[in-house]
């Protein structure tokens, strides 16, 4: 069992970029919130060096309060936490079904998002 001394400790603050509109290959833009670790002086870690990222794509509203207990744990430990509304859901653009099996853009949208984040 891991003790608190062995696990990572929260060392960063949190910087939020709300509703970043990430373009997909067909021109539709998906609303994305990006939480980045920052230093005590407010300098965003992701601007000066690459950080690992956790990506969640949801049809249940990226601003739902349930996420408020999730993202701080990771961001304070140096991860970027990225959460995106699926195509045609909430703040994202596009027409289409939000059911994964019926949405023909789902795979491409996920791929395009990862590629955008990696640049």
Locations of regions flagged by a protein language model:
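Cap/lid segment of the alpha/beta-hydrolase catalytic domain
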Residues: 38-118
């Amino acid at each position: 069992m891991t003790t608190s001394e062995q696990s990572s400790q929260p060392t960063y603050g949190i910087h939020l970029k709300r509703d970043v509109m990430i373009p997909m290959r067909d021109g539709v833009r998906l609303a994305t919130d990006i939480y980045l670790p920052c230093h005590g002086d407010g300098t965003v870690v992701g601007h000066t060096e690459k950080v690992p990222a956790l990506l969640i794509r949801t049809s249940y509203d990226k601003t739902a309060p349930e996420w408020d207990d999730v993202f701080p744990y990771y961001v304070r430990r140096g991860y970027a936490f990225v959460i995106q509304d699926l195509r045609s859901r909430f703040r994202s653009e596009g027409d289409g079904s939000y059911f994964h099996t019926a949405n023909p853009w789902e795979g491409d949208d996920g791929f395009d998002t990862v590629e955008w984040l990696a640049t």
